């Protein structure tokens, strides 16, 4: 029988509910429990696929092709369990499901209302498909008091009564700010947040209190008294140097013990955290440092590249080096020489993106890396720009471009209109909807034997996650390969180019997929481990 942990947030947003949920999942998993993590997002979008990266941050793609919240990336990285499309739902998706049912007549003429129809839809989502799990951790997006979150709060309140007694625990993550003028940590914001939650009928079992310094015992007792929780259930969540310290920090504070106690479970056996200790030790005691330039177009919000950042750090963990990131807005290179920005870095990474803005800057970055023999990693759009650069400057195709930017004389990159997913032929047109219509999720690729990328993977058959609607035009393959660019990986049917590389370059690889989505701190992705290894070698030359 599954037990449910509901994690809510108060006082301010961005406190780290996703990290808290992921860390708790890792701790329970380290005790041998089977854990599932789910995210409930209050916004009205059906999914984040069409949302601006500078507003929402990264769109995390699952193996089964769902475009989801970036917190699912944290869940995967901390637990190693691959998320699915059934692990994330939004208000938009819920209302769409309900409206579809109403149009079909499923409600038999009833007046469709928030209670019970919306709340029932939420409850069904939370409780379905959990028979193989010991714990289901549900993170509620937003902050207590947000009008958008009200149906979710009501649904989890009802679940407290619907589920068997003792199978639901509520954890409230809140902030205890330090006021320099008073020289004190203040409990009042947390008190008011809990009162707001209690007014909704939810009484938290555990308070997880964010603070930038130790919380005095007297303040903990005060929170216990006014928030109606046991003293042992007031758990401080102090700032840490890196997010991979969080599981051990929370274990030290007793979060997992307290959660188990709230369920009436003896907190044994102790979690096996030796792998986490090794990861954190490597982060704390690096044997070197490399600088990686990320030439992107959404650098104003680092969360737009969340999985990418983490995957680079995983590569650092694998090589026992610290990875320093230099963020460069790609449009800069459309006006300025890239050399002053790039000549001191040890590796260049051009990530995914959409649209013409900044594309020429990415092409200049790819040319610099190719000519100067600097390790280059092009992901999705970054691979496409590297191919356009090769077409223009090596294959004598000066008008090489992408149809994503408009009509092109030489469409080296073009819209995919047909591809195979499983046994089904997928078809798209330029006039179709944007949402959910890309090549999404895990696809297999066949790597050419003897290439660098096949050696890195240790295999010629791979599966990686995709999120794109444009693809390198195979009609230019022979012309480009005659100039030294190797198409080292193709879709199994030989139609879609998946990876490229230069054999005469120390490390120049482009991939059409997103390998960062499958990297873990306990299991770094081989491409990122190899890229950072190459950057480490480059650091000895610069």
UniProtKB/Swiss-Prot annotation:
Full protein name: CTP synthase
Q: Its GO biological process terms? A: 'de novo' CTP biosynthetic process; pyrimidine nucleobase biosynthetic process
CDD domains documented for this protein: CTPS_N, GATase1_CTP_Synthase
Q: What else is known?
A: CTPSs have evolved a hybrid strategy for distinguishing between UTP and CTP. The overlapping regions of the product feedback inhibitory and substrate sites recognize a common feature in both compounds, the triphosphate moiety. To differentiate isosteric substrate and product pyrimidine rings, an additional pocket far from the expected kinase/ligase catalytic site, specifically recognizes the cytosine and ribose portions of the product inhibitor.
User: Per its UniProt record, what NCBIfam families does this chain match?
Assistant: PRK05380.1 (NF003792), PyrG (TIGR00337)
Q: Where does L-glutamine bind?
A: 353, 381-384, 404, 469
Which family is this sequence assigned to? Belongs to the CTP synthase family.
Binding residues for CTP: 13, 146-148, 186-191, 222
What is this protein's gene name?
pyrG
Note the Gene3D superfamilies from the entry. 3.40.50.880, P-loop containing nucleotide triphosphate hydrolases (3.40.50.300)
Its annotated function is as follows: Catalyzes the ATP-dependent amination of UTP to CTP with either L-glutamine or ammonia as the source of nitrogen. Regulates intracellular CTP levels through interactions with the four ribonucleotide triphosphates.
Pfam families found in the cross-reference section: CTP_synth_N (PF06418), GATase (PF00117)
Could you list this entry's UniProt keywords, alphabetically sorted: ATP-binding, Glutamine amidotransferase, Ligase, Magnesium, Metal-binding, Nucleotide-binding, Pyrimidine biosynthesis
């Amino acid at each position: 029988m599954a037990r449910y942990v509901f994690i809510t947030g108060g006082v301010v947003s961005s406190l780290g509910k996703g990290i808290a949920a992921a860390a708790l999942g890792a701790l329970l998993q380290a005790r041998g429990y089977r854990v599932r993590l789910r995210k409930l997002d209050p916004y009205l979008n059906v999914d984040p696929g069409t949302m601006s990266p500078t507003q929402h941050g990264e769109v995390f793609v699952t193996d089964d092709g769902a475009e989801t919240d970036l917190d699912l990336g944290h869940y995967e990285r901390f637990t190693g369990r691959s998320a699915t499309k059934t692990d994330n739902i939004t208000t938009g998706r819920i209302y769409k499901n309900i409206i579809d049912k109403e149009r079909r007549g499923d409600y038999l003429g009833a007046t469709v209302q928030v209670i019970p129809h919306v709340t029932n839809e939420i409850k069904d989502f939370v409780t379905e498909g959990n028979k193989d799990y010991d714990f289901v951790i549900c993170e509620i997006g937003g902050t207590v008091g947000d009008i958008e979150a009200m149906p979710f709060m009501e649904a989890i309140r009802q679940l407290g009564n619907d589920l068997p007694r003792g199978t639901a625990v509520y954890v409230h993550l809140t902030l205890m700010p330090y006021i320099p003028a008073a020289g004190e940590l203040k409990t009042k914001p947390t008190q008011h947040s809990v009162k707001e939650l209690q007014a909704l009928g939810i009484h938290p079992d555990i308070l997880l209190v964010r603070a930038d310094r130790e919380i005095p015992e007297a303040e903990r007792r005060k929170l216990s008294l006014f928030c109606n929780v046991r003293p042992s259930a007031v758990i401080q969540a102090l700032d840490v140097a890196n997010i991979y310290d969080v599981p051990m920090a929370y274990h030290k504070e007793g979060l997992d013990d307290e959660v188990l106690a709230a369920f009436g479970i003896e907190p044994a056996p102790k979690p096996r955290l030796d792998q986490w200790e090794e990861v954190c030790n490597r982060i704390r005691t690096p044997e070197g440092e490399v600088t990686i330039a990320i030439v992107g177009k959404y650098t104003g919000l680092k969360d737009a590249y969340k999985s990418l950042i983490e995957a680079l750090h995983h590569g650092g963990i694998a090589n026992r080096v610290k990875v320093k990131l230099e963020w460069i807005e790609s449009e800069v290179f459309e006006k300025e020489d890239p050399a002053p920005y790039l000549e001191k870095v040890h590796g260049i990474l051009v990530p995914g993106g959409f649209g013409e803005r900044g594309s020429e800057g990415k092409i200049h970055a790819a040319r610099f890396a190719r000519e100067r023999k600097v390790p280059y990693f092009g992901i999705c759009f970054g691979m496409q720009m590297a191919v356009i650069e090769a077409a223009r400057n090596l294959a004598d195709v000066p008008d090489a471009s992408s149809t994503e930017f408009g009509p092109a004389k030489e469409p080296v990159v073009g819209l995919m209109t047909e591809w195979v997913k499983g046994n089904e032929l997928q078809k798209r047109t330029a006039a179709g909807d944007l949402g959910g219509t890309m090549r999404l999720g895990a696809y297999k690729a066949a790597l050419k034997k003897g290439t660098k990328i096949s050696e890195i993977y240790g295999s010629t058959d791979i599966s990686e996650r995709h999120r794109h609607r444009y693809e390198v035009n195979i009609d230019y393959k022979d012309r480009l390969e005659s100039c030294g660019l190797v198409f080292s990986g193709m879709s199994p049917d030989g139609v879609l180019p998946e990876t490229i590389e230069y054999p005469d370059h120390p490390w120049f690889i482009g991939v059409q997929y997103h390998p960062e989505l499958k990297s873990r701190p306990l299991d770094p992705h081989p491409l990122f481990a190899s890229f950072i290894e190459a950057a480490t070698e480059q650091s000895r030359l610069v």
